[in-house]
Amino acid sequence: MKLNELKYTPGSKKEATRVGRGMASGKGKTATRGHKGQNSRSGGGVRPGFEGGQTPLFRRLPKVGFTSLNQKQYTILNLSDLETLGLEVINHESLIDHKIIKNSSVLVKILANGTLTKKVDVKVNKISKAAKSAIEKLGGKVEVI
């Protein structure tokens, strides 16, 4: 058997029904839309979320929360990530070189998930207390910028 001899299993590929292609096709004239009414018209149908005049769900439910404009997004790095990187110095330049962050304007935070086995010097925007103590316990330096 060759690639050009491959065939689909009979019945596995069903052809789409073409509507509005003449009366003889059996799906002509109204083309499965029925007679008159909003849905039979071009561009007909109701907007998403419309419930026939009943107060829609999005208006029945209360407004909740908001998006803070002052929120800062941090790229999270765990101690296990620092271990796999295997670097002695972790700063924005080294993270950009290893394609962890795109540019120096990205904020970086280190958390204490995982374990660290070797000394690492860290210079990041934020660090958790547990991560800081784990790094300093191994003789590494932590600087928050």
Curated annotation (Swiss-Prot):
Query: What's one GO BP annotation on this UniProt entry?
Result: translation
Look up the signal peptide feature and give its range. Answer: none
Q: Gene3D superfamilies given for it?
A: 3.100.10.10
Which InterPro entries does this entry report, sorted A to Z?
A: Ribosomal_uL15 (IPR030878), Ribosomal_uL15/eL18 (IPR021131), Ribosomal_uL15/eL18_sf (IPR036227), Ribosomal_uL15_bac-type (IPR005749), Ribosomal_uL15_CS (IPR001196)
What GO molecular functions are on record for this protein?
rRNA binding; structural constituent of ribosome
Protein role: Binds to the 23S rRNA.
Please give the name of this protein. Answer: Large ribosomal subunit protein uL15
- Cite the source lineage: Bacteria, Bacillati, Mycoplasmatota, Mollicutes, Mycoplasmataceae
